[in-house]
Amino acid sequence: MVAIADARYETSSENSLIDTVAKYSVDDGETWETQIAIKNSRVSSVSRVVDPTVIVKGNKLYVLVGSYYSSRSYWSSHGDARDWDILLAVGEVTKSTAGGKITASIKWGSPVSLKKFFPAEMEGMHTNQFLGGAGVAIVASNGNLVYPVQVTNKRKQVFSKIFYSEDDGKTWKFGKGRSDFGCSEPVALEWEGKLIINTRVDWKRRLVYESSDMEKPWVEAVGTVSRVWGPSPKSNQPGSQTSFTAVTIEGMRVMLFTHPLNFKGRCVRDRLNLWLTDNQRIYNVGQVSIGDENSAYSSVLYKDDKLYCLHEINTDEVYSLVFARLVGELRIIKSVLRSWKNWTATCPAFAPLLIQPLRRQRVVVVPLSPRLVLLAFCRQRLPKRMGGSYRCVNASTANAERVRNGLKFAGVGGGALWPVSQQGQNQRYRFANHAFTLVASVTIHEAPRAASPLLGASLDSSGGKKLLGLSYDEKHQWQPIYGSTPVTPTGSWETGKRYHLVLTMANKIGSVYIDGELLEGSGQTVVPDGRTPDISHFYVGGYKRSDMPTISHVTVNNVLLYNRRQLNTEEIRTLFLSQDLIGTEAHMDSSSDSSAHSTPSTPADSSAHSTPSTPVDSSAHSTPSTPADSSAHGTPSTPVDSSAHGTPSTPADSSAHGTPSTPVDSSAHSTPSTPVDSSAHSTPSTPVDSSAHGAPSTPADSSAHGTPSTPVDSSAHGTPSTPADSSAHSTPSTPADSSAHSTPSTPADSSAHSTPSTPVDSSAHGTPSTPADSSAHSTPSTPADSSAHGTPSTPVDSSAHSTPSTPVDSSAHGTPSTPVDSSAHSTPSTPVDSSAHGTPSTPVDSSAHSTPSTPADSSAHSTPSTPADSSAHGTPSTPVDSSAHSTPSTPADSSAHSTPSTPVDSSAHSTPSTPADSSAHGTPSTPVDSSAHGTPSTPADSSAHSTPSTPADSSAHSTPSTPADSSAHSTPSTPVDSSAHSTPSTPADSSAHSTPSTPADSSAHSTPSTPADSSAHSTPSTPVDSSAHSTPSTPADSSAHGTPSTPADSSAHSTPSTPVDSSAHSTPSTPADSSAHGTPSTPADSSAHSTPSTPADSSAHGTPSTPADSSAHSTPSTPAGSSANGTVLILPDGAALSTFSGGGLLLCACALLLHVFFMAVF
């Protein structure tokens, strides 16, 4: 692995003393060698070589840099080229093996000037200077070396060109095409026989061009990705360099693109986001930088099924490089690509087919060209949002009622809206301003009192100014709309008849088709002045039009959007004939929008706040992103799925350092979002299934602790609900499916880290249900998992205070079951403790709301029993496992809402315990495991919502515990592994954004740990494994949001630690690894977003490691100047196969040379 970067020794200015340096590793980043690749001329204090742009071919590195001797101004402001030169240095990599040890070296040739290849005149202009695009350049499929470059002319105008060599660098030429003026720092890739050149534009949206031949002019890619990304929320700030690379993932060729949101403005450029596109659909993977850190220049590398990002961070003009492993982001990408492939595979050319996976969506898809963009589908339940089938952009709905095969809009303002420019900064349907085809099937149920809108494109947010549309009037006539051109009503319509509508616009000409026939008067100019329109949104009905003179009654069966020219007559006819297939049952279960970011478990206990099992996407601590998909540490977006402790988002799909399960968007710990799937620990949502401890909900199935409801399954201790399904610990929702502790969402399916269960939804104190949805953070189980306060269910996984099943462990109000552990929100244990919000446990007894019991197993409001397991609301028993809301018992396991017990295992919402395992939002417990809303217990394992315990394993948001295992939302514990967002830890290894590790307990959002492995924003813990927002723990291994590691350590965003290996965003430390955004630590290795440290090993968003230190978001180590905008290259077996780079500003306020690089573990 090789890194190339600017080394700025004295200041962060680009006009200072700068060298180009290289650092390389042959042992997966364990050790590094450093070289100066290209020295500046040393003729003045501002001599410099800048903006390295790198090509890798075979085992050679071609590095192009600009050279300046004494000038002190920015290069594009130079009036002539006297102080400028352009240099090419070639490095040759050799590797050898001796005695089983691999060694490598890079031999750099002397830089050669290429100034002689730069013509004095170009396309009628007098030229001045040129530089590389500052990033990765490419080797074309024909073997040519291709550099995208930025050129200035004598008028100081900047534009982009292609600079290429056909003979491995001996001679060079400029291609004929060029960009518009103002386009700088270009990056390029090869795509389907063309070059795609992506350029920075200050104060405006990015321009992307296509070039099919070096001898032909460039063409702006207006129908795909040009003008999609803005430099800031209002597109009125400077732009930024970007990474733009083509890779093959899951068998699909796609492009990865990074770009900061720049909320702060100017050249600060904060919140670096990662995007995915196949040159048709565009998906926001999420934010890859942390919080609001300034992270302009970046580079992405995908190699050996691993994804990495190198980016700079700027803190008060002190620059550092950060290298991050994007584990969760890669899982999200794979999930999205599976969705795309499933939809595409289900829709062969001209073969329309209705999609209805898992009863959640109904859409007819007719791909008429490779450039098909499916706009949205209708959800089964009453929606506030209609999600795009390709998971890119959602639509908003108002006054919508779910009907067979579609949505019925009724009442004033009833309709749907799909944003175009309303998406804000990043507009994924920007192509529609040039050409589009909009298709829908509609049925009108009654005549309006005046003309009412039916379908179209609007130029303003109010919907008053339309570009193209169709209305229907009280005389049963159609009223087409062609811009401001007056049109006479034509044709006729019938009540109750379904019509197939097609609206097309290309070359500023609009047409309307009804049932395959061109409507009279079509073919009108919709933009008379010739300007390019700026479409605000597409609409169906009178979406939120309060000025509507009539109440609309329209049913929409399907809506599709094509990003292409007007369809021809044959294609229109094909669309019309396919409508008869609408209503056919579907075949594409895998493409459904099921729960997200969790992975299914088989014959096991599924619960909330469980850690991911296999390829899962977990998310957390994301910040808002605006008009975009927001994800981990992202910022708000508009109509979108939000996740992981994120703030509300509007149109976007958000996730956070998580890993999706099956082509699905899921979230957890998220705050309210609109058109989104909301889950775990969220507050009420609309059209959602709400659960556990929820307040009343309407049209839903209410469960878990609920009081009676009408035609509904209501359960344990909840407040009444009407036709709704509510489940454990959630707040009220309206016609929606929400789950435990979830925040409000609108028309979405909320699940909370759970995966689907088998047609049954059982809940606390509820009666058995069939074909239903199971909730509260549970994952599916096969031979059934039953939980507290429920009645029995059969081969199904029931969650959150649900009733017992057979063969299972029955709890609260249930009948006993054998060897199975069922509980709501429990974490995994072996043969023991079941707790709330955890993962499954085996041969253990969990219960809920039970009172104390004596050597017996009693359940649900039962009186004391002997040698048995007691559960919910039962009377006291001794040596028994009691749980959930139980009163104190002795030598027993108590859980969920239980009162204090002694030698007992209590979980979920329990009070503090000592020598026990406490978890999730619990209060402290003593040598006892207490669970679910229980009071303190002694010698036991306490979990879910419990407070601190000592010598235990504590996790997610837990409070401290003593000799116990604490999990989920618990506070500090001792001898424990603390993770994510924790503060200082001592003798431990810290990790970041990683998922479970072995042998160690890793979790997320935990607080500090001591003699333990502390990671990601975690605080110290003592001899306990604490995770997820937990407080300090000691000797343990902690991780968060990462992938599993074995006796290894990964960390991020943690604060200072002592003899510990911490990483990610930490400040400098000495022989140790310190973590993310942390303060200094002693004898530790500091890495990731940290200032330089010595012998350190850092990794990012950690992937599995073995007895090694892995860290995340690590910055350069070793006393040196800092570097940025670098290039990373993978050089396996002497062959440089991939590149990874950035370019531009980098500083470490240190006059020392060389050691200016980040550390990384591969």
From Swiss-Prot:
GO molecular function, one term: exo-alpha-sialidase activity
Region described as 44 X 12 AA tandem repeats, LTR domain: 589-1120
Region annotated Disordered, chain positions: 587-1123
Superkingdom as given in the UniProt entry: Eukaryota
EC supergroup of this enzyme: hydrolase
Cell compartment(s), UniProt: Cell membrane
Keywords: Cell membrane, Glycoprotein, Glycosidase, GPI-anchor, Hydrolase, Lipoprotein, Membrane, Phosphoprotein, Repeat
GO CC, alphabetical: cytoplasm; intracellular membrane-bounded organelle; plasma membrane; side of membrane
Cross-referenced InterPro entries: ConA-like_dom_sf, Sialidase, Sialidase_fam, Sialidase_sf, Sialidase_trypan, TS_C
Sugar-bearing residue positions: N342, N394, N1125
Record-linked SUPFAM superfamilies: Concanavalin A-like lectins/glucanases, Sialidases
UniProt biased composition (Polar residues): 616-689, 699-1123
EC number: 3.2.1.18
Catalytic activity field: Hydrolysis of alpha-(2->3)-, alpha-(2->6)-, alpha-(2->8)- glycosidic linkages of terminal sialic acid residues in oligosaccharides, glycoproteins, glycolipids, colominic acid and synthetic substrates
BNR repeat residues: 23-34, 163-174, 209-220
Membership in a protein family: Belongs to the glycosyl hydrolase 33 family.
Functional description taken from the UniProt entry: Developmentally regulated neuraminidase implicated in parasite invasion of cells.
Protein name listed in UniProt: Sialidase
Gene that produces this protein: TCNA
